[in-house]
Amino acid sequence: MRDVKYVDAHCHIEDKAFNKNRDEVIERAKKEDVIIVTSGASLGGCLRALELRKKYNIYLTLGYHPSRVKADDKVIEKVYNLIKNNEYEILAIGEIGMDIKDENYKRQEEIFKKFLSLAEELNKPIVVHARGFERKIFDIAKDKVDIMFHCYSGDVELAKEIGKEGHLISISTLVCFSEHHKKLVESLDLEYLTTETDSPYLSPIKGTKNEPKNVKLVIEEIAKIKEMEVEEVKDVIYKNTCKFFKRRL
């Protein structure tokens, strides 16, 4: 079987948490043959992500996190225009979506639909943050664009429906220690999945920041659960992710 790379389909290498060691983190990922897709989720994060793409030749998505909906409309409009003006630099729009833990669901939905319309206009897939709103987000967007459910934590039956409809479930480093996420992997066809770290969050190693190289642990855990070879899992995940982003990575 040909040698393929690991894919961290969603992380935040532009996060300020990496300011002191970003070079080393990216170098460690490259040494482990990890493809990095970083996700700008605020105005500042999107601007930093664009700069990092130029410097490190990594991939990116740009969006606006639902936790930031209290921001002034002018800020949201700046992010909107930034995405529109950099459509050829991005793989997808995201992360965007809704979160049950944040307030003002109506405004969250309005902002999500604004960026969803932009994705339709630009013919881009979306990467969604949908904690507590998995069904709602799916019903709104499923017939409009391709969807990747970042760090999916919803129920198994909805995940199966998402996969059968041709959308993608992203399995994060939570699978290394969460029984629910192990059950998701056990229950879902591998063709429905991609992998991520959500770095610097969700570290599988206690007391450390997460980083893209740890996506290897996700692949290894999936292989263990599925009773498959690591290389076979890598290959399928890579193909799934390239298909979703509509390009070879």
Curated annotation (Swiss-Prot):
Its EC number is 3.1.-.-. Pfam families: TatD_DNase. This is Uncharacterized metal-dependent hydrolase MJ1582. It is an enzyme of class 3 (hydrolase). Its cofactor is a divalent metal cation. One of its GO terms (molecular function) is metal ion binding. Belongs to the metallo-dependent hydrolases superfamily. TatD-type hydrolase family. Signal peptide: none annotated. A divalent metal cation 2 binds at E95, H129, H150. InterPro entries: DNase_TatD-rel_CS, Metal_Hydrolase, TatD-like, TatD/YcfH-like. SUPFAM superfamilies: Metallo-dependent hydrolases.
